[in-house]
């Protein structure tokens, strides 16, 4: 069966950063806060004129970080910061949060932590497992609505729409240990309800042109 790739491009917009108030789970607080502060200072020195260019530069700083899946799955749910292990999602979130922080002329790890929380959780609020934006499509929609990202897929002339229902997690409950908890399951199910027969913009790979993609764009392939 031919595989179809759904591609979303997002350009970073400026937002106001303030210090985080919620508890944070660091993998190693001294190492993490030092690495974040150092990276933010170095990123600020680059003086990039557009925030999305900062995403690219931040990504380059951590491109060699060892891959590790499941780093966010500890209980209870709280913002987790781990600069020594990243997966596809946490890599993008880290680069984006750093870009937003520096774009706002901040170089404090506390401001970075705040921006990371804003990106990772629905409405920027940590309220249990279900408040995390588990689906990349939901992540794009929620952050776009709050002005942290700008969805630009449908602005490209050869973009199309696919009607999809987000229900993979609750349809594969056994694959997600946290969903054994009935409250977590109900919360994720409630989030999925907002995406029943939802129209998602996408571009087929053969229709992508180099001129459509700018440095720092976030591209999600499914």
Predicted feature locations:
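Cysteine-nucleophile amide-bond enzymes
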Residues: 20-222
């Amino acid at each position: 069966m031919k595989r179809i790739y759904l591609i979303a491009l997002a350009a970073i917009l400026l937002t106001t950063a303030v210090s985080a108030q919620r508890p944070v789970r660091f993998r190693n607080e001294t190492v993490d806060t030092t690495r974040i502060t150092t990276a933010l200072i170095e990123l600020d020195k680059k003086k990039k004129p557009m925030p999305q260019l900062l995403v690219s530069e931040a990504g380059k700083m951590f491109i060699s970080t060892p891959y590790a899946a499941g780093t966010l799955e500890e209980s209870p749910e709280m913002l987790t910061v781990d600069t020594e292990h990243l997966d596809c999602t946490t890599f993008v979130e880290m680069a984006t949060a750093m870009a937003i922080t520096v774009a706002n002329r901040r170089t404090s790890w506390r401001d970075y932590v705040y921006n990371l929380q804003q990106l990772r959780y629905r409405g920027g609020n940590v309220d249990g497992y279900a408040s995390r934006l588990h689906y990349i499509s939901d992540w794009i929609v929620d952050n776009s609505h709050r002005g942290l990202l700008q969805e630009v897929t449908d602005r490209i002339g050869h973009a199309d729409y696919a009607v999809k229902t987000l229900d993979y997690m609750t349809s594969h409950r056994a694959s997600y240990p946290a969903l054994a908890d009935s409250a977590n399951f109900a919360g994720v199910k409630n989030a999925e309800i907002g995406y029943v027969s939802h129209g998602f913009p996408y571009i087929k790979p053969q229709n992508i042109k180099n001129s459509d993609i700018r440095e720092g764009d976030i591209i999600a392939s499914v």
